[in-house]
């Protein structure tokens, strides 16, 4: 049995600056603004409607939704900034040293559900936490196609890898494997999509992988790495900013390439069926959904990630050799998209 290395205590050089919360909060709001502006320009028709909200226990946020656009059937981009007396059990299980401390959390999240089945759904989330003596960054971005286009997957992964490599060359290999592990529907034994990057509890110390599976590919890869020089708070903040700003270059060219592809009822019905997997994941496994519900977050904002239309079909099986069959049989399996 492989045992994950214990995390190192945070040292003075890596402690957050006095204005850390203010700076990260400002960036998360700016990221929301930049993404919304970019998506409105890309869509060409729809406009985001903003809904500001306050949380009784402390904090609040801005929810923005674009519905019935040109390529977007529905998309939401959220900013939130909350604080309180105690982190929920789902996080304390991973960071028990935060127990008994007040917490602060801020982040931006996004889910886009396009109309055209040939344009993939996409998800993004970047977040920052402080709780007493501990702090960390988390987040990632992932792509969920309905029809298999290897060049789209390669472009998305290349763009995220370039953002990761500017901080450390081992970030992408670990966080890509972690993403494959995280966005997996155990009850279906299926990947949700073709992944991207996912990371959590990053405070600049080893190991890079901080997930629940000590024997999985992400943990095995992370554990065999040579010792990595500890990174400071500023390094990780810059990393989060680069990843956040890599989204539009990663996704926009895919939209432009696929938005005018003709489709019929067969493709639309398959898209709605596969959206069911998205709903299942978000309601059963998604860490952000669980955190929001456990901290009395705003339900409308938490469930903003769900598609406007979806369907389930009992014991559905795609036609052998069809693009629909290829999606799950060959495409939605962990693979090296960068070098494929």
From Swiss-Prot:
Enzyme class at the top of the EC tree: oxidoreductase
Induction: Constitutively expressed.
Location(s) in or outside the cell: Cytoplasm
Subunit structure: Homodimer.
Stretches for region Important for dimerization: 278-313
Catalysed conversion reaction: coproporphyrinogen III + O2 + 2 H(+) = protoporphyrinogen IX + 2 CO2 + 2 H2O
Pfam families per the UniProt record, alphabetical: Coprogen_oxidas (PF01218)
Protein's UniProt name: Oxygen-dependent coproporphyrinogen-III oxidase
Family membership noted in the UniProt record: Belongs to the aerobic coproporphyrinogen-III oxidase family.
The entry's keywords: Chlorophyll biosynthesis, Cytoplasm, Heme biosynthesis, Manganese, Metal-binding, Oxidoreductase, Porphyrin biosynthesis
PROSITE patterns assigned: COPROGEN_OXIDASE (PS01021)
PANTHER family on file: COPROPORPHYRINOGEN III OXIDASE, MITOCHONDRIAL (PTHR10755), OXYGEN-DEPENDENT COPROPORPHYRINOGEN-III OXIDASE, MITOCHONDRIAL (PTHR10755:SF0)
Polar residues bias (residue ranges): 1-14
Listed Gene3D superfamilies: Coproporphyrinogen III oxidase, aerobic
Cofactor: a divalent metal cation
Biological source species: Synechocystis sp. (strain ATCC 27184 / PCC 6803 / Kazusa)
GO cellular component: cytoplasm
Pathway info: Porphyrin-containing compound metabolism; protoporphyrin-IX biosynthesis; protoporphyrinogen-IX from coproporphyrinogen-III (O2 route): step 1/1
Binding site for a divalent metal cation: 113, 123, 157, 187
Catalytic residue positions: 123 (proton donor)
Site, as annotated: Important for dimerization: 187
GO molecular function terms attached to this record: coproporphyrinogen oxidase activity; metal ion binding; protein homodimerization activity
EC number(s) from the headed UniProt entry: 1.3.3.3
Consequence of gene disruption: Cells lacking this gene fail to grow under aerobic conditions, with accumulation of coproporphyrin-III.
Binding of substrate, residues: 109, 125-127, 296-298
């Amino acid at each position: 049995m492989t045992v994950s290395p214990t995390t190192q205590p945070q040292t003075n050089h890596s402690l957050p600056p006095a204005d850390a919360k203010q700076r990260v909060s400002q960036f998360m709001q700016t990221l929301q603004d930049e993404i919304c502006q970019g998506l409105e320009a890309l869509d060409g028709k729809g406009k985001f409607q903003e809904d500001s909200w306050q949380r009784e226990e402390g904090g609040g946020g801005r929810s923005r939704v674009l519905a019935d656009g040109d390529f977007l059937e529905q998309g939401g981009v959220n900013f939130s900034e909350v604080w309180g007396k105690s982190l929920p059990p789902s996080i304390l299980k991973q960071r028990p040293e935060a127990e008994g401390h007040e917490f602060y959390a801020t982040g931006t999240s996004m889910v886009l559900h396009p109309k055209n089945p040939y344009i993939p759904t996409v998800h993004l989330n970047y977040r920052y936490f402080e709780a007493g003596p501990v702090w960390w960054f988390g987040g990632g971005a992932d792509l969920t196609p309905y029809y298999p286009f290897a060049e789209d997957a390669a472009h998305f992964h290349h763009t995220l890898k370039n953002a990761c490599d500017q901080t450390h060359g081992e970030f992408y290999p670990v966080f890509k494997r972690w993403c494959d592990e995280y966005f997996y529907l155990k009850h279906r034994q299926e990947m949700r999509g073709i992944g991207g990057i996912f990371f959590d509890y990053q405070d600049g110390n080893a190991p890079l992988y901080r997930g629940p599976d000590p024997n999985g590919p992400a943990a095995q890869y992370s554990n065999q790495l040579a010792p990595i020089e500890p990174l400071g708070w500023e390094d990780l903040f810059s990393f989060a900013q680069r990843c956040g700003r890599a989204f539009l270059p990663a996704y926009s060219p895919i939209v432009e390439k696929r938005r005018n592809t003709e489709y019929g009822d067969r493709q639309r019905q398959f898209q709605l069926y596969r959206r069911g997997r998205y709903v299942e994941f978000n309601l059963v496994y998604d860490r952000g959904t669980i955190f929001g519900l456990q901290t009395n977050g705003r339900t409308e904002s938490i469930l903003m990630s769900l598609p406007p239309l979806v369907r389930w079909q009992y014991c559905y099986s795609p036609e052998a050799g069809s693009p629909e069959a290829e999606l799950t049989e060959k495409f939605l399996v962990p693979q090296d998209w960068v070098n494929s």
